[in-house]
């Protein structure tokens, strides 16, 4: 938790992307409590042109990966196509699946019903459920 970035819940109970809190020795106990209560989430960097690396060990990992992949924050600015430019943000590393229900339809296919907070990808969840070796089936 020390050095991790955490975002608190917004007024709807989902992750508040506008408030990034760095875990320190002073707030660690409270942040751990809030994360266990589902009122805060540890987040990872989704890089963009206005991003800054996280402090501490996490930031060193970010720098290492970006260097190995030959990626820089400025690479996320797309000249002449501003709609493709990414400013950067943080996303929860784990998220609760809400109201998950499933059934098998009349053709024998599974049907899932659930909802996720804003910024969480249903395709990622379904990929984890399907666990196919063939990435083209998603």
Name every feature range the model reports, one short phrase each.
Residues 1-138:
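Non-catalytic, substrate/partner-engaging modules appended to enzymatic cores
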